[in-house]
Amino acid sequence: MKSSSFRRAIVPGVIALAAALTACGGGAEGASGTVAIDGSSTVFPLSNAAYELLQEENPDIKATVGQAGTSGGFEKFCAGETDLSDASRPIDEEEEVPVCKKNGVDYTELHVATDALTVVVNPDVDVDCLTTEQLIKLWEPKSKVDNWQDLDPSFPDKEISLFGPGTDSGTYDYMAGDVIGAESETTRTDYEASEDDNVLVQGVAGTPGATGYFGYTYYEENTDKLKALAIDDGNGCVEPSVDTAQSGEYTPLSRPLFVYVNNKAYKDTAAVKTFTDFYVDNLETIVEAAKFIPLSDEQLAETKDTHEGMSG
């Protein structure tokens, strides 16, 4: 399902950027058909922006852009139900890759942007920074933390309400497996969960004492409603930003974002090839439209090289 609130936020910028693309000649004219995309709610704004921009050049290509979560997206992708899969983590070598192989789904991984998983609080929470250890203590599977003072006696005596992604989300996987490092690869379960980051934004913004986490994009769209916490991983408090994510300073919460493309669909279906080519050829503009963290020059060159190899 598309996010109408996101569409309202980016449409003016998309129209302006699309005009620039059209003036330069995007080469996306002529093809028609449908493209099925699903997966990460974090990557959704990026792929949706690509579709909005492509529509300005070729309205005959129609796309469905879903938000089933990274794991849910890979389940559909490896079953051959979708052409592209948005992911906020690499495909799992032990569980998901064998399913793709079993079903004859050959694919290409494209690194499309960088994200900073952002820990936010309701503005009424007088806390500015958490250590990685405090973040783990808050979200680990057996956590009993329910008051801010449980993390630090100097924090406010205020009850904590928690909001976070559901278990199908790559954002959840990243927090559970990479940040917390729990053997069970789970977090605590007593929180309000949603695969839609907009629901999490509304929950934290509307609940005193609340905190949650999601991709940087959704925080940047809602800075008037939320406060982002800096994270101290041992070298002082570092705020989430484009610069700190690209430089690697914002650890352990920065991460790469991917789009996986079904190679057969790319070769056999004109609409899929046109969409994918447009996506990569205009990646910098699309990232700007969706307000993601762009790839470094080296990363962008690697992605373009990988894309060129798909036509070989």
Language model regions located:
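Bacterial N-terminal signal peptides that target proteins for export
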Residues: 2-13
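Exported/periplasmic ABC-transporter solute-binding proteins
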Residues: 3, 25-71, 75-78, 82-94, ...
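Hydrophobic alpha-helical context, especially transmembrane and signal-peptide helices
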Residues: 14-16, 30
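C-terminal motif of bacterial Sec signal peptides marking the signal peptidase cleavage site
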Residues: 18-23
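Acidic/His-rich segments in extracytoplasmic proteins that coordinate ligands and/or metal ions
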Residues: 94-102
